[in-house]
């Protein structure tokens, strides 16, 4: 699918750029988050709905989750990583936060 192709392109780019590597990644529908990760297992999950967003937003979420592999909270050290590698990350975050996540009835089943 489109998201898998885009992640296959951009995840290695950001891993190489930051030196932060995930063990694996998966996509799934999420109703409250664009991405999540498990720093212990170094696994990343990306919201399937990112396929419908501008590529810059996908790159931001990939970088955001990779940064969590090093820093677990959203404090100054975390934002410094984002600032270093993506100076306009706040704009991409705002763009995502201003958009909606789709509700899928099947999520209740």
Could you describe each region identified by the protein language model?
Residues 65:
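Walker B catalytic acidic pair
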């Amino acid at each position: 699918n489109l998201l898998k192709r885009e992640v296959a392109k951009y995840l290695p780019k950001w891993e190489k750029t930051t030196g932060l590597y995930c063990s694996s990644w998966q996509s799934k529908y999420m109703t409250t988050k664009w991405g999540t990760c498990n720093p212990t297992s170094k696994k990343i999950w990306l919201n399937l709905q990112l396929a419908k967003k501008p590529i810059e937003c996908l790159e931001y979420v990939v970088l955001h989750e990779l940064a969590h592999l090093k820093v677990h909270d959203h404090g100054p050290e975390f934002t410094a990583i984002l600032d270093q590698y993506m100076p306009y990350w706040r704009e991409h975050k705002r763009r995502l936060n201003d958009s909606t996540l789709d509700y899928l009835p099947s999520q209740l089943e």
